Amino acid sequence: MRHYEIVFMVHPDQSEQVPGMIERYKTAITNANGQIHRLEDWGRRQLAYPINKLHKAHYVLMNVEAPQEVIDELETTFRFNDAVLRNMIMRTKHAVTEASPMVKAKDERRRDVAEDLDEEEVDDVAEDSEE
């Protein structure tokens, strides 16, 4: 089986359907003895240019190992699903399991905010003890 990176963008009005779509695609891959190495739901993001007069879309990234038949099935599903604005399926040489730069940046921001909050709590406690 080969390794693939799949990115698809969903119409922003259909964002509530994304978890169900992901579940269907995961089931199709695992039923064909495939593996999902990485699955990231990036949420709504700004588009680089308008698509069908839309400026935002819901992004999903998957790195999978699956037979060609499943990939063909996913491609057909993407093509005939009106909620999917764009999709890209690329074959990769190896399984990619590490977090994408998008997720790494998000985690760093969360960590920075958490550290800032911890520092503020320490400052608040110090001020309270001085009074």
UniProtKB/Swiss-Prot annotation:
Keywords: Ribonucleoprotein, Ribosomal protein, RNA-binding, rRNA-binding
GO molecular function: small ribosomal subunit rRNA binding; structural constituent of ribosome
Residue ranges with Acidic residues bias: 115-131
Keyword Transmembrane helix annotated: no
A matching Pfam family: Ribosomal_S6
Task performed by this protein: Binds together with bS18 to 16S ribosomal RNA.
Record-given protein name: Small ribosomal subunit protein bS6
Organism from which the protein derives: Proteus mirabilis (strain HI4320)
